[in-house]
UniProtKB/Swiss-Prot annotation:
InterPro entries: Tim10-like, Tim10-like_dom_sf. This is Mitochondrial import inner membrane translocase subunit Tim8 B. It is found in: Mitochondrion inner membrane. The twin CX3C motif contains 4 conserved Cys residues that form 2 disulfide bonds in the mitochondrial intermembrane space. However, during the transit of TIMM8B from cytoplasm into mitochondrion, the Cys residues probably coordinate zinc, thereby preventing folding and allowing its transfer across mitochondrial outer membrane. Keywords: Acetylation, Chaperone, Disulfide bond, Membrane, Metal-binding, Mitochondrion, Mitochondrion inner membrane, Protein transport, Translocation, Transport, Zinc. The gene is TIMM8B. GO terms for molecular function: protein transporter activity; zinc ion binding. It comes from Homo sapiens (Human). Its main location: mitochondrion. The keyword Zinc applies. The keyword Zinc-finger does not apply. Probable mitochondrial intermembrane chaperone that participates in the import and insertion of some multi-pass transmembrane proteins into the mitochondrial inner membrane. Also required for the transfer of beta-barrel precursors from the TOM complex to the sorting and assembly machinery (SAM complex) of the outer membrane. Acts as a chaperone-like protein that protects the hydrophobic precursors from aggregation and guide them through the mitochondrial intermembrane space. GO terms for cellular component: extracellular space; mitochondrial inner membrane; mitochondrial intermembrane space; mitochondrial intermembrane space protein transporter complex; mitochondrion.
């Protein structure tokens, strides 16, 4: 197998990082849905009633908002540390 050039290695690292981010995002979505399902769904049926749909939507929205706020705050801390 031929050795990778510097540019090829950088591209490979970028692709691996992108795939890791996708996997992390997917895992996070599944985690949110599992937590929200346990919180909101009392009796699974053929269809979700409007109360359950609203609960699931609000629950996931709260988790996303919280994650974004924490990520933003962490980025601010990192940026201040780099100055």
């Amino acid at each position: 197998m031929a050795e990778l050039g510097e540019a090829d290695e950088a591209e490979l690292q970028r692709l691996v990082a992108a795939e890791q981010q996708k996997a992390q995002f997917t895992a996070q979505v599944h985690h949110f849905m599992e937590l929200c399902w346990d919180k909101c769904v009392e009796k699974p049926g053929n269809r979700l009633d409007s109360r359950t749909e609203n609960c699931l939507s609000s629950c996931v929205d709260r988790f996303i908002d919280t994650t974004l706020a924490i990520t933003s705050r962490f980025a601010q801390i990192v940026q201040k540390g780099g100055q």
